[in-house]
Amino acid sequence: MTLRNKDKYNVYHSSRREKLGNELSICSSIKNNNIRCFILDSRSNKKHCYGPFRSYHSLKRWILFKVKSSNALPNKLGWSYGHIKRSMDNRDNITYALIEKAPGNIFQLKGIIVAQSLVDEAELLFVFVRRDSRRTGLGAFLLNNALRHLASTGTIDVFLEVARSNRAAVLLYEKNFFRPVGTRTKYYKQGKAGAEDAIVYRRTLSS
């Protein structure tokens, strides 16, 4: 199964390149929307770009600041700023950030994916798209950029978990060739509301 981007956006690779020790990244962009998907992979030896950000670390700090100040995080499913920061700090993990340059030279974090990559398997630990950017194709664009990068690192199988009631996310994953392989009963704790099952999905990538 080959990686395909079925959404409406055209992708191109930036010609800007710069070095920062061993911490490298690559960058792609949506032409007509001034949106870029930045990849923070501390283990990569590929060329990278950080657009308006000075370095890997300044981009990471900016992402964490935006995450911390966001009121749109799905905390009801157990994710918090602390969870995301610890995941981003783990050197086995890769962060994919979708950033838009708005009028007035203002930058907005539209979505992020944090993935854990070990040998030929990866797990998407956290997938988030801002509420005002959902159902626009941006989620698929971010997801497919992440899958392309994971495939380039030798990943074969990609796993993720999603709440059974999250129909929008379920449709996104199934449209992009993820298939259910199991269920984790009462995985998501929701306080007095009880707990909700998580569906485990897998997608097998091929060269």
Segments predicted by a language model, with ranges:
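Extreme N-terminal basic, low-complexity initiation segments
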Residues: T2-K8
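Acetyl-CoA-dependent GNAT
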Residues: F38-R43, R61-R134, A140-N145, H149-T153, ...
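Short amphipathic helical patch at the helix-1/turn junction of helix-turn-helix
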Residues: V129, A163-R164
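Short glycine/proline-centered loop/turn elements that form peptide/ligand docking sites
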Residues: G139, L143, S165-A169, K186-K192
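Conserved GNAT acetyl-CoA-binding A-motif
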Residues: A151-E161
